[in-house]
Each structure stands twice: as structure tokens, then as C-alpha cells.
Amino acid sequence: MIIVISGPPGSGKSTVAKILSKNLSLKYISAGHIFRELAEKEGLSLLELNKKAEENFEIDKKIDREIFRIASTEKNIIIESHIGGWLLKDIADITVYLNASIEIRAMRIAKRDNIPFTKAIEQIIEREESHSRRFLAYYGIDLSDLSVFDLVINTDNLQPDEISKIIEAYLNFMLAKNIH
């Protein structure tokens, strides 16, 4: 079973993927974690590495190759990745897109990173613009095209455990119908 969770920053990808990993006994893989490790190793902030990645496609390719390798060789995993749904749509059993309003996402990020709300908004806008430019230029991926996803969930008014229950119910429905 390969489940891919995608979505913009602050949508709840990591939190929900970790809950599902535990509930379904799946190995948790985070593209964001790999990206953050690279930023730390390079002595850069996430925004700085995003800007560097706009100039150097190899940064994204390296991370995406590693995620693709893992998805191609391991089973029983859940992958959390901004663009995983697009890149892994032919490998994944189920692709899920989580979204939330920019205000809710900024509140979550401000709380998580202990930064002012306005700074969180600025970071979200910068990261999303960087992602949109890079992924369209490098892969031809339009981040507004959600047609590749099996399930799209607005997380504004839902708790992480509620979101995971929705995904688990969908998964059980699809398995019962033998569709994936």
C-alpha cells in the first residue's frame, strides 16, 4: 500500500501522514523533512533553499529522485510531499490533497514555528510562488490541477484525527470495491 499526501504549506500534510502511518502501520516518508535536512546541511533557511532551487534544478531533482526510489522499492509506506501526488500518481495506490485557507495555514505555521502571523503569510506566499514556478518549469506540473488526486479535503474546520478518519474511510471503501 502506497499512500501519497500532498498539499501546500500548513495544510496538515505532515500531521495527518504521521497519524495515518501509526494507524495503518505504514512507514512515514517526508519529502519536506529531506528538504529541511538539506537546508540545514547547507546552512540555509527553507526560503533561501527554495530560492537556490529556482536557479538549480538539481536540488529538486535529487530530492524527487530519492522519493521516487523509495516509492518504487518499498511497500506499505505513506509519503508526504508537496508534489508527490503528481510525481507518484502512477505508483501510488491512493493520492490525497489537503488544502486550507491561507489564513488557517498561516495560523498553523505561526504557531508551529513560533513566528508572527504576518511573517507566516509572507513565507507561505513566497514558498508557494517558488513552488509554482519551479514545478511548472521543471516538470510541467500545474499545482492548481487537482485532477490527479483521488481525494481532496479542505482541512480548515477539521482536526487531524478527523482528517485521518476520512482518509481511512475512503481507503476502506476503495479496498472493499477493489479500486486503486
Swiss-Prot record:
Pfam families the record matches: Cytidylate_kin2 (PF13189)
Reactions mediated catalytically: CMP + ATP = CDP + ADP; dCMP + ATP = dCDP + ADP
Sequence similarity: Belongs to the cytidylate kinase family. Type 2 subfamily.
Domain of life: Archaea
NCBIfam families noted in UniProt: cyt_kin_arch
DNA repair recorded as keyword: no
Entry keywords, A to Z: ATP-binding, Cytoplasm, Kinase, Nucleotide-binding, Transferase
Protein name: Cytidylate kinase
SUPFAM superfamilies hit by this protein: P-loop containing nucleoside triphosphate hydrolases
Gene Ontology CC terms: cytoplasm
Residues that hold ATP according to the record: 7-15
Organism for this UniProt entry: Sulfurisphaera tokodaii (strain DSM 16993 / JCM 10545 / NBRC 100140 / 7)
GO terms, biological process: pyrimidine nucleotide metabolic process
UniProt GO molecular function: ATP binding; CMP kinase activity; dCMP kinase activity
